[in-house]
Amino acid sequence: MSNGSHSSVQLKSSTYLSKPTFHFAAGLLSGLTSSILLQPADLLKTRVQQSRETAALLPTIRSILASPHPIQGLWRGTLPSALRTGFGSALYFTSLNTLRTAVAADDPGYLFRGGHGSKPQNGNSPSGVSASSALPKLSHTANLITGAVARVAAGFVMMPVTVLKVRYESDYYAYRSLWGAAKDIVRHEGVRGLFAGFGATAIRDAPYAGLYVVFYEQSKRSLASLLGASSPSARSTPTEQQKSPPSTASINFISGALAAGLATTITNPFDVVKTRVQLMPSKYKNMMRATALMLREDGMRSLFGGLGLRMGRKALSSALAWTVYEELIMWAEKRWAEEQRDVKGVL
């Protein structure tokens, strides 16, 4: 009897410990998938934003395709991009889940109007979990704040990789390797150079991530209601899941694309400023100076350089990343729920 009890305790303990780890792994996989597939769009965005000619997309594409190694040229910078997006997504999703779960567990609905938090019971997900995901369902205000905080924290940790990615993708620098780029930056700009543009990045990422989560969750609810779909949760039976057209994945994918398009349009000026500061820190120095110079030299249009590319890439990357992440987490939640039921059945 004691052995059975000990096994039960071990299983529950491993379940609690595995959840943050799996959120990290799911975020890493989703980030790697989207970054590798969409690297050409990210490279083109960087090249377009570095130019004072905001309509330089076609010449940039022709230049790359005319090079001796066009395929390699389109995927230049894949390694730093994959590292940044992969581990950045892992840190972001893990932090976001931790924050949202903590908010839901403390039941702060009276602080965040419309919140539906509640304490987890018996090791299961909080009752505030949305039907379309394993994440807690919060109010718009709570979604905005948790999304912004999680993104800025992950962005700070990954900022050196982001700077290396931007410099390596740009044709302003002739770096032969990432290690060579890192040594050159530290030699000429100090460690501070590895964090160039963090202010603009934080100001871009905080509202983007917050708005994205708000738009994403609202879009999922609206689409599910409009299409009459009840997306499967960890507690759904196989029969109930078969009666859920369209699938959870399709709702999450469409919602991710729509949310990214809206959030990207609103925050694009910050992205352009960030790119200029990271590429030419000696000229632009900081966000305020960069914005003033860009408006004086190139006009308002310069703040929306690369918008089409960024919107297309963000829509696809966010839709892919969030769909893969949500599906992996829901799969894991179902497996953990089944394990708990099996253990209870044995006991």
Curated annotation (Swiss-Prot):
The domain of life is: Eukaryota
Q: Does the keyword RNA-binding apply?
A: no
Which GO cellular component terms, listed alphabetically, does the Swiss-Prot or TrEMBL entry include? mitochondrial inner membrane
Q: Which UniProt keywords apply?
A: Membrane, Mitochondrion, Mitochondrion inner membrane, Repeat, Transmembrane, Transmembrane helix, Transport
Membrane topology recorded in Swiss-Prot or TrEMBL: Multi-pass membrane protein
Which molecular function term from Gene Ontology is one that the record holds?
Answer: glycine transmembrane transporter activity
Intervals holding Solcar repeats: 18-102, 138-222, 247-331
User: Which residues span the membrane?
Assistant: 24-49, 77-103, 144-169, 197-220, 251-277, 306-324
Would the keyword Mitochondrion turn up in this protein's UniProt record?
A: yes
One GO biological-process annotation of the entry reads: glycine import into mitochondrion
For this protein, the record's InterPro entries field holds:
Hem25/SLC25A38, Mitochondrial_sb/sol_carrier, Mt_carrier_dom_sf
Where is it located? Mitochondrion inner membrane
Pfam families to which the protein is assigned, alphabetical:
Mito_carr (PF00153)
Which reaction is catalysed here?
glycine(in) = glycine(out)
Q: Which family does it belong to?
A: Belongs to the mitochondrial carrier (TC 2.A.29) family. SLC25A38 subfamily.
**What HAMAP family has UniProt attached to this entry?**
SLC25A38
The protein's job, in short, is: Mitochondrial glycine transporter that imports glycine into the mitochondrial matrix. Plays an important role in providing glycine for the first enzymatic step in heme biosynthesis, the condensation of glycine with succinyl-CoA to produce 5-aminolevulinate (ALA) in the mitochondrial matrix.
Record's protein name = Mitochondrial glycine transporter
The species is Coccidioides immitis (strain RS)
Taxonomy, top ranks, is: Eukaryota, Fungi, Dikarya, Ascomycota, Pezizomycotina
